[in-house]
A protein has these predicted regions:
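A short, N-terminal "cap"/entry segment at the start of jelly-roll beta-barrel domains
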Residues: 1-27, 94, 114-118
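Conserved short histidine dyad/triad with adjacent acidic residue
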Residues: 29-46
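Histidine-centered metal-chelating micro-motifs
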Residues: 40-41, 60, 79-88
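Glycine- and acidic-residue-biased ligand/ion/polar-headgroup-sensing regions
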Residues: 48-60, 64
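A cytosolic small-molecule/anion-sensing beta-strand core signal
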Residues: 55-56, 74, 93
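Short acidic-glycine-tyrosine-enriched beta hairpin
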Residues: 67-83
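Ligand-binding loop in jelly-roll beta-barrel domains
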Residues: 83-107
Length: 118
């Protein structure tokens, strides 16, 4: 068992418009994210199942390389994304959200998540 205080974790500045903190065990990871208005998470997919919950702002998701249809998540909304499903996202306003992944995102742990570091 490990006790962690989020307030004592340093935020990683992944790029000029994205900060995150995350913790993980062997089978699950949770990340607290902050994005500036207009940031786009480009098309990507990963083996990990993902649950996203929005606390502030609007997070717009597109799925399956379909740029015409989208889903907006507002504060209090959550979405479950199955593993290997292509998606991208746009931040409308300042966005504060959490992402939970199972299994943990190894590319985030080892810093090889280059698609976010541009």
């Amino acid at each position: 068992m490990t006790k962690i205080n989020w307030n004592q974790l340093a935020a990683e500045q992944v790029n000029p418009k994205m900060k995150r903190k995350f913790i993980h065990g062997e089978k699950v990871m949770i990340a607290k994210m902050e994005f500036e208005d207009g940031f786009i998470v480009p098309w990507h997919s990963h083996e990990n199942e993902q649950i996203t919950e929005v606390f502030e702002g609007t997070l717009r998701f597109w799925f399956d390389h379909d740029d015409e249809h989208f889903i907006d998540l507002l504060p209090g909304d959550s979405i479950i994304i199955k593993g290997n499903r292509p998606h991208k996202a746009l931040m409308i306003g300042k966005v504060v959200e959490t992402d939970t992944f199972s299994p943990p995102r190894q590319d985030w742990i080892d810093g090889s998540d280059n698609y976010l570091r541009k």
